[in-house]
Amino acid sequence: CDIVREYDTGNYYGWRVATRLGGAATIHIVYLLGIGAMIEALLHGWRRWISVPVLTILLVVLVLSGSRAGIVGVGLFAGMLVLWYAQRRLHTLKARAALVTTVLLAVCAAVVGMSLMRGSLVDRARVLTWRTAWHAATTDVATVLFGVGYGRLWPWLGGMTGALPLRSHAVRTTFFGASLPHAHNTVVAVFGEMGLVGLAALLVIFGVVIVVAVRAVRGPSRVLAMTILASLPGLLVDTYLIKNFPVSLLWWVAVFMLLVLEAE
């Protein structure tokens, strides 16, 4: 319904599907979590007449979002599902190695296909943005440690609220240099604005999440753990968790659900 409303009001960016919950570059996180929930429902035989259509819709809108990170995430999630399903039936090392190779090739094919459609995962605009962030964050010892300050390199909230004229998605000249409206990389965003201290905190947080999720893959919460793991590579090509708060909130809810389930 949200997607239909966006198109009805003309609030969209080119052909890419976006919603008020999140833009085309980040909404794939919500779709990926929903896909995981529907897969879990199918594995438990829960109302397939609902699960199958919803799963199909989520896959379609994810592709229509044009998110390269979303395609990679779904590919990784599907690969992990296939490996989990097959390891229960493949008993030889040779067979498992062949399966792993096949899954990796399929993921690579998905990346290549998306690159042919929309260009490479890393385009010139992102390179310029990351270079600007590097120069800004390495001007002196203080900025290396603490960054230039949250919201200074990329005042995205000002653009969203209309306080600043930052509606365009194109590269613009800023006080620090040429840059997109946001970093298109969560790691770069944290380092550029919060320095090594912020980056260390980010790595600790995600280190804990990865350890818990990897352990959970072997238990009953494996599908939820796989969706969380599959969402992490997108951090390198898009910015979320420190912006796009509705999408980030849903991701953190999923993470805390996994933590609670594992604690029990």
Which residues make up each language-model segment?
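Transmembrane alpha-helices of multi-pass inner-membrane enzymes
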Residues: 78, 224-264
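Membrane-interface micro-motifs in multi-pass membrane enzymes
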Residues: 16-33, 67-70, 183, 191-195, ...
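Alpha-helical transmembrane segments of multi-pass inner-membrane proteins
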Residues: 1-13, 19-87
